[in-house]
């Protein structure tokens, strides 16, 4: 199974608008970070994790092939704001979106034109003489509620949602297959959730920066401690802002089995 890191930045991305710090001025491409998203691929299945406002740019260099589903960690714009940009992929068929009920409700409310079918059916039932036609440019998407600790499959990829806290907001992390887990925007995780990560060998987890605590995101030290709890053999950090520092300098501060992921990084798990 191949994982491609499409974006490894926070909601503002890096460079940050209006900033002239050394990270935002860096010419090292690994210091430029789009909003967080990832692509999980097997020989037969392609699964997106999150779909933020940079998704068009992130998918442009990749082969144009069917997307079998999208896992949504939570409702914030930097994780769902690019869903409409998936419409070219709908020529391969309807794209299922998977998320908790609150996230899916938010997506429907923000993009009602993407989900007109229920409304059309209700109108046709009450006013059968009114001949309605769907706008042909509307993307074909389906909303599929998922629940923590209830596994499901997308193609040949098995997914187990896990409870995570983004500050006070409950969100989802994902164990994908037997050996891999992807968690972003975490501040904390209930202790009883750790059992669902037992045996994970490759962990992806967020780490905003080294210093200055944040109310809803963990720092690098928190992420390293969490990886130790999980017992992962290899950990990749994501969701940085420009305070993380230059990639080469930041990487030198990390343990041997913890790496700073960067946009475009591909790993096999």
Q: Which residues fall in each region the model found?
A:
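Cap/insert and terminal regions of metallo-dependent hydrolase folds
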Residues: 188-268
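Binuclear metal-dependent hydrolase catalytic cores
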Residues: 1-182, 192, 249-269
């Amino acid at each position: 199974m191949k994982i491609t890191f499409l974006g490894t930045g926070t909601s503002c991305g890096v460079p940050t608008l209006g900033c002239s710090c050394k990270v935002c001025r860096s010419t090292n491409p690994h210091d430029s970070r789009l909003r967080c998203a990832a692509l999980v691929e097997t020989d037969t299945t392609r699964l997106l994790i999150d779909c933020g406002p940079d998704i068009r740019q992130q998918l442009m260099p990749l082969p144009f092939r069917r997307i079998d589903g999208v896992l949504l960690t939570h409702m914030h714009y930097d994780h769902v704001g690019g869903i409409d940009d998936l419409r070219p992929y709908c020529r391969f068929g309807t794209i299922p979106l998977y998320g908790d009920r609150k996230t899916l409700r938010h997506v429907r409310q923000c993009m009602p034109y993407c989900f007109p079918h229920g409304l059309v059916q209700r109108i046709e039932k009450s006013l059968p003489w009114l001949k309605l036609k769907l706008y042909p440019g509307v993307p074909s998407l389906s909303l599929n509620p998922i629940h923590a600790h209830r596994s499901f499959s997308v193609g040949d990829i098995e997914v187990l949602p896990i409870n995570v806290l983004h500050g006070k907001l409950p969100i989802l992390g994902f164990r994908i297959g037997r050996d891999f887990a992807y968690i972003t925007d975490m501040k904390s995780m209930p202790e009883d959730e750790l059992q669902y990560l037992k045996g994970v060998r490759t962990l992806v987890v967020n780490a905003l920066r080294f210093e200055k605590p944040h109310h809803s995101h963990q720092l690098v030290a928190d992420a390293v401690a969490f990886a130790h709890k999980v017992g992962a053999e290899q950990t990749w950090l994501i969701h940085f802002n420009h305070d993380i520092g230059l990639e080469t300098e930041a990487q030198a501060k990390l343990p041997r089995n913890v790496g700073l992921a960067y946009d475009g990084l591909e790993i096999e798990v």
